[in-house]
Amino acid sequence: MLSAMSLRAIERLGIMVNNIFLLLLALAMLATKHVIFDFFLQTSYQRKNKGIYGHPGGLLHAGLHAAGTCSIFLVTTSTALIAVGIVVGEFLVHYHIDWAKEHIGYRMKWGPQQDAYWRSIGIDQWLHQLTYVGIVLVLATA
C-alpha cells in the first residue's frame, strides 16, 4: 500500500508503519487537502457559480479537489483503475454536494445571518468528510 521510498522515509522517523497508520495518513491528507482547496484556494468565481449546474466555476472547483485527491497516491498504492475510479468519484460527489448546497441556499434565500445558512455549510463539510472515509474504505479493501 505504501511506496518503498515513502515507507523508508516514515520509518526513519521512528514511526511504526502498518495498514491502519497508512489509512489514517491518507484520511488526514484528504482532510488537509479539503481545507486548502475549499477555504484557501477557492476563488470568488468558483464560489459564486457552484450553484449553477454545469457552470465552469463549479466544475473547476470540483476538478481541483479531484486533482488534489491524487496526493494520497504518494503514500498509498493502488491499481490505475482504482485510482482513476477514486478521482472521478471524488469529482462527481464533490461537485454535486457543492451544487446542492448552493442551489438550495439560493432558492431558500439563506444568508450568513440565518442559522440555516450555517447548518448547510456544516452538512456540506460533513458530507465531504464522509466522502473521504469512503475513499479510505475503498483503499482498505482494494
Identify the residue ranges that each predicted region occupies.
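Hydrophobic alpha-helical transmembrane segments
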Residues: L2-A142
